[in-house]
Amino acid sequence: MDNIQSYKLAHIFDGSYGKLVYGIKKEFLFAHPELRYTIHYEKNDLFKYSSISKPIDRVISHKTLEKEDRVLIVLDAPITSSDIQIICVELWWKTGYIFIYKRNGMFSDPYRPEIKVETVITGVTNSAISTATEEPREFAEPPPPPATTARSSMQAFTELLERLSGNTAAPQDPTLSELTNLELVKKDEPEIKNKEDGILYGVELSTAIYRKPSDQSIILSPFWCNHKHWVYYSKQFTISAPTLPASKITEMDLEDICKRNFFLNQNKVMLMSLPEKKLSFQPKPQMRPLFIEEMMTQEHLNHLVYECSKTATWALNTLIPEYDIVERLDKVDKGVYNVLFYEKKVKPGRKYDMNTYPLMFYTKYGLRFDHINSSKKFKHIAFCVKREIVGVEVTYYDELMNKEWTELLYGEILPKVPIIQDFLENMERLHRQVVDGNITISAEMSLDIDNRIRRMLDDAVNDIPFHIYFTEDLERYIYHPFFPLPVMSPFAERFIDTDTDAETKRILRFVSEIRSKAENV
């Protein structure tokens, strides 16, 4: 589902006029202006569909979410009886849909398994509940919101978000708890059935709760359907989700979700940069001599960048499980992370293991989340050789020890057959023929030279190892030994200003001289 990523959630109730608020990526919302939602209810343990299906008509921007490029969408979810519960929320548009499951009762934190917590919503006034003498109303249209108090519900909602994000201390104004109050209650504490101005409702939270834990080693909610979700965690949650129509589950194209949300994300710029010195098989300075820069025009560089981009995307896609083993959503994790993981369906005669899909089955990849804080301070490095990923490595910075750690997750980091020298010799031979041969270059020869360089660059992309860095903010960086100049991906439809680069000017002058010779023949 295009660019949906982990939903950060708060629930707001204003009288009986229930509201669900989800954080969603701006780019997804703008890409699907026809987005609608359906609320699925349960009453007396009977799963039912609600007749409420509406477009998204309220969007809120907030400073706590601006840095993540998110907005808040507000969904009307009226609850008119204490025995009605929300099963799940369905977001849907013309070409797809996605279910947002509720949290169901008790769950345990995988990093603190001894603590059992449950989620409850407070702040629904007694006057909003249908009394026993009244006829129960199923999925009735909500009454109008109550009159505005001295403290507006929007102001209370803003303070709630700030509380959840850890930006401010909890406000002491009692009117806030009357409007919006999200709590985590320990299992051992007695459940309060009634308060002076409110009642605890049986509406559980959906997806990942947005909180800032005091223990910074606990990871905040990850992206929706990115590479983290392909691993089986050693500590899994107990799942109890309602039965949904099998047809809607099997129709969800999970492979497409993964590709679009992580690897084929065209809204992020894939930056091209020079190799780092610390990498193991980087060429020495003399291995990238001047004649390479003289022979490669800006068009050649663009071609090299484009081919590397395609190769990197293709290679990373090989890490995604095939559709026939992710054809249905097996379970939805209800922990802090809302982790999706897939049921392995092995066809007769086929075997799937960690060597087939390393990032899905590699135990080490999942266990590392026990001690690595999820932030932009760590990155993954994929080593691409002959259009295949031969190794995956993670590098992260430990703030407590003030040290950078590197851990090999899969495969190896060294190339098997480096052929850098062959490329250099061929390019140098061509350079001597063009520059030192004192020959007149015709238009036909110029075209032939251009084609030869392109073929050599294609071979370099295929055979010369390069690195693909991908970070938690979905940005990818490619490091190739033969990027003589840092250029940006053609997918971004913009390049570095060549007029400000002296080396580029020299290359362009060289190309201009060759072309002028060809035109004068």
UniProtKB/Swiss-Prot annotation:
Species annotation: Ostreid herpesvirus 1 (isolate France) (OsHV-1)
Domain of life: Viruses
Protein name, as recorded: Uncharacterized protein ORF58
